[in-house]
């Protein structure tokens, strides 16, 4: 794999944690996160709402933005969230977490968006 270009120590630590995991999905996520900031995806809530199923765990290797509404109960993990998206996620009784927290929980069925 390429060397990490990020100078953010939190992201560097997350990439190292993901690389140590045995599952292929975590290694894929490490590659996506190690991209430059402008090449990481930004995903709107409307897109997540359209493609996700209730009860699902979604990971965004970038930022979650607030455009649209969320009417399903899902768990969203991302590197960052806009303040408005956090409010909308809370109002829909869904849950949002940093990717590092989700990795520690070791979820079984996850989907990567973006």
Across the structure, where does each feature detected by a protein language model lie?
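Extended polybasic, low-complexity segments that bind anionic RNA or targeting/receptor surfaces
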Residues: 1-114
